[in-house]
Amino acid sequence: WRMIWEKRVEAIVMLTNVDENGRRKCEKYWPGDTERGSHGEFEVSCIDNTTLGQIIRRKFKISHQSYPNRTQVVVQYHYTAWPDHGVPQTTSELFNLRRIVRTEF
């Protein structure tokens, strides 16, 4: 969250799932839909969660303890259909993801 705050990142694209075939593939670094997470000096809350086919778009509001009057919004685009091994069978959803991100940013 520090890098997102310092560089004022507006979008994150995630291509892996947290768990695949019963194995942990990455850490879930974001809070759930109605949760608020504390990460050191940062507080992160999910303010929107929308499913767009095989893509989940989550919006997070980030605040910093030292800057109480400043908040930042970052959008995570989570592509949920990348297989554990190999590549997706078609490219249509990946191009859809690319189109969505480019349209919004």
Swiss-Prot record:
It comes from the Eukaryota. PANTHER family: PROTEIN-TYROSINE-PHOSPHATASE (PTHR19134:SF562), RECEPTOR-TYPE TYROSINE-PROTEIN PHOSPHATASE (PTHR19134). Disulfide bonds: none annotated. It catalyses: O-phospho-L-tyrosyl-[protein] + H2O = L-tyrosyl-[protein] + phosphate. Keywords: Hydrolase, Protein phosphatase. CDD domains: PTPc. This is Tyrosine-protein phosphatase 12. Its EC number is 3.1.3.48. The lineage of its organism: Eukaryota, Metazoa, Chordata, Tunicata, Ascidiacea. It comes from Styela plicata. The keyword Transport does not apply. The gene is STY-12. Belongs to the protein-tyrosine phosphatase family. Residues 1-105 form the Tyrosine-protein phosphatase domain. One of its GO terms (molecular function) is protein tyrosine phosphatase activity. Substrate binds at D84.
